[in-house]
Each structure stands twice: as structure tokens, then as C-alpha cells.
Regions:
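S-adenosylmethionine/decaboxylated-SAM
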Residues: 8-13, 17-207
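N-terminal, positively charged/glycine-rich alpha-helical extensions of SAM-dependent methyltransferases
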Residues: 1-4
Length: 207
């Protein structure tokens, strides 16, 4: 699947090349462990996640510009096991349908402050591994960064790795994958956080 994505024969994640690499590496700790994506879009990130797990669940309301069927068709064509949960990320029906604890969650749905914070507050209880928040430090969506930083300040979650436009959160200070990344790349280390970003660092880090 990865080769087909690299050849542009399948949708790719809406990420920079560095962020795609970090996304892939951070999932490598959780081979065939339950994973969840909230906000599927065209399915590029979900396909990348399927490289690491056969226990993948996808939440989307499908009321944006992309339909569900092309994504569904890809997973059926390549016989990738996946469970679709249709609905808004914050809806009670969607939350009630979640029966798993996930090792990796990719949040890429809400871009407002309230929506991002609500997703983090609701979905962190379903995760005992890593949460990746997409569009962190993305200038188009500043409220994502603000909401994520406020969530971290008021919870036991830590920012352990910051890429171009995404951040990885964990209750731990490090994961095996984040340690390997630290050894491979020139990074900025501050308060146990690893920064690989050309964006403005979070305000509490600047200070």
C-alpha cells in the first residue's frame, strides 16, 4: 500500500514528507494494535495506518466535500480490514459505539478551538498510547494549536514530538519510536519535548 501511495496510485496523507515519515515511525511501536482515525477525508492517512494494523476504525460524518464510497472501495479492493463509524466525532451515538482502547489515535476532524478541545477531552480516555493531532502549528488552523496546548496544560498528556504541522501526545515522556527519531534527526529538545518544525514553537516552550 505504501508503494502505491508513493506512486500516487492511492490517496496520500495530507502531510509534508517529514510529517508523513514521523507519522509512520510513531505508529511502528503498535504493530497490529487497535488504532483509530477521527476525520478520514480521502483516506490517505487511514491507508498509511493500515500498513501497521489490522485493527483499524475510522470515524467521519462524510458531510464535507469528499464522499465515503471511494474510500470504502479502496479498502474493499485491497481487502483491508477496517470498521467505519459514521457520524460526528462528538455525537453520543458515535462515542457509544466505541468499544476499544486504542494504542494510536489520529485526530484530523475539527479545526475550531472548541471542536479540537472537545475531541481531545472525549477521545483521550480511549487511548493508552499516542494521540497524533493533525494541523498543529498549521497557520491556516491556529485554533487547533491553541486548543491542543490548553489540553496539555490541564491534563496528564505530554507533547513528546512536534513535526511541521502535527504533534504527538503521550502520557509518557517518550516512546521507543520517539527515542529513535531523536537519534536520527537534528532536533530541538526542550522540557522533554522533541521539536522538528519550521513553525513557531508553542508559547509555553518559547518562554
Amino acid at each position: 500500500m505504501l508503494q502505491l501511495q508513493l506512486q500516487n496510485k492511492l490517496p496520500i496523507p495530507g502531510k509534508t514528507n517529514l510529517d508523513w515519515y514521523l507519522f509512520d515511525q510513531m505508529m511502528s511501536d503498535y504493530h497490529n494494535q487497535p488504532m483509530l482515525e477521527v476525520g478520514v477525508g480521502r483516506g490517505g492517512s487511514a491507508i498509511a495506518m493500515s500498513e501497521h494494523t489490522n485493527k483499524l476504525e475510522l470515524i467521519d460524518s462524510w458531510d464535507q466535500t469528499w464522499p465515503k464510497k471511494p474510500v470504502e472501495d479502496i479498502f474493499e479492493k485491497y481487502e483491508i480490514p477496517v470498521k467505519f463509524i459514521d457520524g460526528k466525532s462528538g455525537s453520543l451515538d458515535v462515542l457509544a459505539s466505541i468499544k476499544s482502547q486504542y494504542k494510536f489515535i489520529h485526530l484530523d476532524a475539527n479545526k475550531s478551538y472548541e471542536g479540537t478541545l472537545d475531541d481531545l477531552e472525549k477521545y483521550n480516555s480511549f487511548c493508552d498510547g499516542v494521540i497524533c493531532v493533525d494541523d498543529y502549528l498549521q497557520s491556516m488552523w491556529p485554533e487547533v494549536t491553541r486548543a491542543t496546548d490548553d489540553f496539555v496544560k490541564n491534563s496528564e498528556w505530554n507533547r513528546i514530538l512536534i513535526g511541521n504541522h502535527q504533534v504527538f501526545l503521550s502520557r509518557k515522556k517518550q516512546t521507543p519510536a520517539s527515542r529513535k527519531i531523536t537519534l536520527k534527526f537534528p532536533v530541538v529538545l526542550r522540557n522533554d519535548e522533541v521539536h522538528l518544525t519550521y513553525g513557531k514553537l508553542p508559547e509555553d516552550v518559547d518562554r
